[in-house]
Regions:
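Intrinsically disordered, low-complexity terminal tails/loops enriched in metal-binding residues
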Residues: 1-271
Length: 271
């Protein structure tokens, strides 16, 4: 596997070149019960397995999962198998329809490919998201504030989202790398069709890249670039991205603080 240092990738995959087979073992999944998620990336032309994926942020595959109502989120990394498949032993927390975004970068691809998949667990009610804009989050004694530049976010225009982290009213300055980055940000639109993923590096894209070569990261998967301000390890961490359309978006930001990966969540509105 080739090592690659990328901060952003395309959202939608190129269906003319790549496909993703997805099965669960067992096929019927019950909440809280063990299940194996198996992903097999393939060449679309001849249906052969893609066995040489690039390593991006220390992993060949990043799997982002959300519940249908966007109240639950997970960031996992399926393990490579000799036959070219990737497996993850998992337990879904509740009955629901889950949306899975499998993010890979084939060796012969110029950017990443994101595959949007779905799995219904138990008797899912499929409650729609009810998102209310919120730029503050508290958890485990830490306070997180999301600041945007510009303040009014606009579809199709670049924006910088800065997360300010504090504890006891003091800025946190001991943020450590997580998967080769100071932080990770995942952004998903209210309809779950647009997916953005940002990291602390110097270039950015979105799913709009698949629709518009100008690049950004969204639609059905993407990444945005991230830089950090002030001290290299906090308290401000800034992510640059581009929202592909107007509407509400759920934002998850992950940081490694005091040896633990902590996840903050927000909701932003884009005009």
């Amino acid at each position: 596997m080739e090592l690659v240092d990328e901060s952003v990738h395309n959202g939608l995959h190129d269906a003319t070149k790549f496909k993703m087979d997805f099965v669960t073992l067992p096929s019927t999944v019950a909440p809280t019960q063990p299940v194996v998620l198996r992903f097999t990336p393939k060449n679309a032309a001849d249906n052969t397995s893609l066995k040489n994926l690039k390593i991006v942020h220390e992993m060949p595959m990043h799997l982002l999962m959300v519940s249908h109502d966007l109240s639950w989120f997970a960031h996992e990394h399926p393990e490579a198998k000799p036959d070219g498949s990737y497996e993850l032993a998992f337990r879904f927390p509740k009955a629901d329809k889950y949306h899975l975004y499998a993010d890979i970068t084939p060796a012969d691809a110029s950017h990443n490919q994101v595959f949007k998949l779905e799995k219904t667990v138990g008797q899912a009610s499929s409650v729609e998201p009810n998102l209310t804009p919120n730029v503050r989050f508290s958890g485990d004694g830490y306070e997180y504030e999301l600041r945007s530049e510009p303040t009014a976010l606009t579809a199709g225009k670049s924006a910088t989202l800065t997360i300010v982290i504090s504890k006891g009213r003091k800025g946190v300055t001991n943020i450590e790398n997580y998967l080769g980055a100071l932080g990770h940000m995942v952004i998903i639109s209210e309809d779950r069709e647009d997916f953005l993923h940002a990291h602390p590096e110097d270039h950015a894209h979105t799913t709009a890249e698949m629709k518009d070569p100008s690049h950004s990261h969204s639609g059905s998967g993407s990444h945005g670039a991230m830089s950090h301000e002030g001290k290299a390890n906090g308290p401000n961490v800034s992510f640059m991205t581009l929202f592909p359309k107007s509407g509400k978006y759920k934002v998850w930001a992950q940081f490694n603080i005091d040896g633990k990966v902590r996840t903050a969540q927000f909701v932003v509105s884009v005009g």
